């Protein structure tokens, strides 16, 4: 942690100015104040944070080597914006509001000296956690667009009721060749993905209905074709296999 630190009110108030800190080795900036109220043991947090990196190629340096193959040949382009804030009181049964915005613009992803790759990558993701009114919290994927390597996908989604029984509303259109993507970029010893998915689908469901196999309560319209989908990672605890889903 590097910062200009201001202590006040008998050390009950801490102000960070131009702070630099690392979260899972990712460099972030932080500005704001944390104030403690001894009379009721509450803490007021007013903090704004942002990812210090703005270039996609620089971001790749912070992702563990185990997830890539041909890492030294990977070339990424585009800008990334990640900004967040925490505002409100923290105490017994009191949680502040938290917001996070993440955007990728004009993104692309290629292997050096190979023309084919991810030619287009765009994402706009918003997360809002409402401390006083948790039922109003949500995750909104405003846009995910990916094109290249036999893949062309557009997707939007929103998840509400996050803390009880998350409700998902999503739409996707396009084709994803997981086999090709995995072969080009991922280390199969860490994460193995195979299969092809073709979709033009809108769907709404809750996580409980999906987990409990209450498929009659899952509402979908459009088409979804999966010619074998496999995703396996021992380190991530992932083992998924879907075959001939139409």
Predicted regions and their residues:
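Membrane-proximal interfacial segments on either side of biological membranes
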Residues: 1-4, 8-15, 26-142, 151-246
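Conserved N-terminal beta-sheet scaffold of ABC transporter nucleotide-binding domains
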Residues: 18
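Short aromatic-centered micro-motifs
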Residues: 21, 109, 146
């Amino acid at each position: 942690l590097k910062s200009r630190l201001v202590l006040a009110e008998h050390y009950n108030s801490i102000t960070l100015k131009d702070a630099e800190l690392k979260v899972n080795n990712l460099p972030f900036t932080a500005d704001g104040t944390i104030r403690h109220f001894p009379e009721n043991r509450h803490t007021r947090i007013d903090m704004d944070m942002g990812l210090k990196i703005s270039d996609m190629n620089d971001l790749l340096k912070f992702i563990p080597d185990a997830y890539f193959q041909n890492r030294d040949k990977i070339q990424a382009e585009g800008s990334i914006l990640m900004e967040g804030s925490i505002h409100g009181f923290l105490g017994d049964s009191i949680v502040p509001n938290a917001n996070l915005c993440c955007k990728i613009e004009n993104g692309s992803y290629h292997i050096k000296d190979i023309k084919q790759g991810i030619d287009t990558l765009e994402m706009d993701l918003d997360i809002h956690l409402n401390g006083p009114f948790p039922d109003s919290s949500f995750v909104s994927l405003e846009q995910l667009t990916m094109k290249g390597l036999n893949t062309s996908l557009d997707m939007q989604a929103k998840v509400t009721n996050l803390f009880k029984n998350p409700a998902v509303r999503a739409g996707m259109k396009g084709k994803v060749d997981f086999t090709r993507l995995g072969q080009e970029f991922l280390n199969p010893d860490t994460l193995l993905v195979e299969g092809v998915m073709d979709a033009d689908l809108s769907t709404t469901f809750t996580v409980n209905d999906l987990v409990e196999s209450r498929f009659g309560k899952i509402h979908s319209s459009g088409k979804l074709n999966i010619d074998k989908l496999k995703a396996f990672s021992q380190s991530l605890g992932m083992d998924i296999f879907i075959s001939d889903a139409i």
